[in-house]
Amino acid sequence: MASELQRPDSMPCHNRQVNSTSSPSPEHLLAEDRVLDHAEENNAAMAKLTLLPGHAHSSVLSERDSPACCSTNLHSENHSDSSDSGNYDAPVGGDSLLGDCELSRQIGAQLKLLPMNDQIRELQTIIRDKTASRGDFMFSADRLIRLVVEEGLNQLPYKECMVTTPTGHKYEGVKFEKGNCGVSIMRSGEAMEQGLRDCCRSIRIGKILIQSDEETQRAKVYYAKFPPDIHRRKVLLMYPILSTGNTVIEAVKVLIEHGVQPSVIILLSLFSTPHGAKSIIQEFPEITILTTEVHPVAPTHFGQKYFGTD
């Protein structure tokens, strides 16, 4: 009997551990409460963050944590500077990425970004890759241009219409409102013309040539030809790379001289710097800019490589 009464004291130690865990001490409970409270505070803070749709690398707006937001963007900018060397891409200083909270507030809804996904990211990577062949470069550029043009068409007005199907049924749909045209800023803007024609076969396209004056180094208009009724049309202005924004600003001024209002101009671009986008919006607050990426390093080699003159 004595040996049987002693058995409970000689049970394996892991049973005693389970028993101690099932009856936590008051100090342990207080520690768990502190962890849960901390997690709830973090969740509440995260609930105040708003991401632009599809852009994990883009704007992060916070009601109370803007310094943290901006520090993240500065890290991204430093990383990009270390990964791009030489004059292949031209950095434009003065601003960080679009993720900079203050820049996002300044530009606002007039700057529209394509929803980011791996397909677009790969196309951007190939276009920026110094070792990419011209064939791969053009193929990727044309694909990205097509995506930008398709999204640009979504910004144009539609109207409801009724059609009859081959089986005799009525179908309520939509169609473009008349009065749209494209304008390419030569010469890199001409790379986007085919993408627009692939989507709108009969659209009219004008051209404008702007270059820097050799003496004054200021943007100067050398050639401009538009549809005669452009003042009554909505304009898709095509220019793939926004670096300083000066060329686009000059082009918009010419369009205004021909009776076009900035509010009906949609600028289609592949890449933009923060400085370029902000300069255009500050000059013309009503214009709409559509691009795939806002980054301080602009691939200014685009036109030369696309047309084989690099």
UniProtKB/Swiss-Prot annotation:
Annotated residues for binding of uracil: 300-302
Stored SUPFAM superfamilies: PRTase-like
Phosphoserine sites (modified residues): 25
Transmembrane segments: none
Protein's cellular compartments: Cytoplasm; Nucleus
Residues that bind GTP: 134, 143, 177-180, 204, 233
Superkingdom field: Eukaryota
GO BP terms, alphabetized: female pregnancy; lactation; response to insulin; UMP biosynthetic process
Isomerase in keyword set: no
GO molecular function: GTP binding
Location of region: Disordered: 1-27, 62-89
Biased composition (Polar residues): 16-25
Pfam families per UniProt: UPRTase (PF14681)
Protein name: Uracil phosphoribosyltransferase homolog
UniProt keyword terms in alphabetical order: Cytoplasm, GTP-binding, Nucleotide-binding, Nucleus, Phosphoprotein
Binding site for 5-phospho-alpha-D-ribose 1-diphosphate: 187, 239-247
Entry's family note: Belongs to the UPRTase family.
One cellular component (GO) term of this entry: nucleoplasm
